[in-house]
């Protein structure tokens, strides 16, 4: 199973970028993993939030294959503890050919993307910057991989 993380917009902070790259490399020792970045929309001042979500949604959907399992990182998604995420990921590894996570743009996802999604996860009830979510999520995927393998990274 291949795991893909789709990001809307570049990671601009060099400290976050370094951490994300480090965790992505670590994840790659456990599972095939890649990060795909969809460029941010340009000249959006004249667009409504809905128009922006629709345009970003079209770009997200173009990245998908029909058989992909699509998981949105969304404030309304299920909250899981790290152990639960590991069990969830292990189950998905056995059933999905490509597991695709998406961290959306500043206004969230279009209805078309929500309709296509197989699942939604939330990292917290707290609000994080999109840059921070990328780092926290890659760390959690790495943590889940170490839990699945029974390695000592995670402590209860």
Kindly give the residue locations of the regions a language model identified.
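Loop/turn-to-beta-strand initiation segments
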Residues: 2, 97-102
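Short hydrophobic segments within beta-strands
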Residues: 6-8, 36-38, 102
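Short, surface-exposed alpha-helical segments at coil->helix boundaries
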Residues: 17, 21-24, 54-57, 111
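Conserved strand-to-helix beginnings and helix N-cap segments that scaffold or border functional pockets
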Residues: 17-20, 82-86, 114, 134
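Short glycine-rich anion-binding loops that position phosphate/pyrophosphate groups of nucleotides
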Residues: 11, 75-78, 105-108
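Structured adenosyl-cofactor binding patch, chiefly the S-adenosyl-L-methionine
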Residues: 111-155
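N-terminal beta1-alpha1 ligand-phosphate binding loop
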Residues: 1-27
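S-adenosyl-L-methionine/SAH cofactor-binding core of RNA-modifying enzymes
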Residues: 32-33, 37-97
């Amino acid at each position: 199973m291949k795991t893909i993380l789709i990001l809307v917009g570049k990671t601009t902070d060099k400290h976050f970028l370094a951490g994300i790259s480090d965790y992505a490399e670590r994840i790659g020792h456990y599972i095939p993993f890649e990060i795909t970045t969809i460029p941010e929309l340009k000249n959006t001042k004249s667009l409504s939030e809905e128009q922006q979500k629709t345009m970003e949604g079209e770009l997200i959907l173009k990245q998908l294959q029909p058989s992909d399992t699509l998981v949105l990182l969304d404030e309304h998604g299920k909250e899981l503890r790290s152990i639960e995420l590991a069990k969830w990921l292990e189950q998905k590894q056995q059933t999905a050919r490509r597991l695709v996570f998406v961290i959306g743009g500043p206004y969230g996802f279009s209805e078309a993307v929500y309709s296509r999604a197989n699942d939604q996860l939330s990292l917290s009830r707290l609000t994080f910057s999109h840059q921070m979510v990328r780092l926290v999520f890659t760390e959690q995927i790495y943590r889940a991989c170490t839990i699945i393998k029974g390695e000592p990274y995670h402590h209860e």
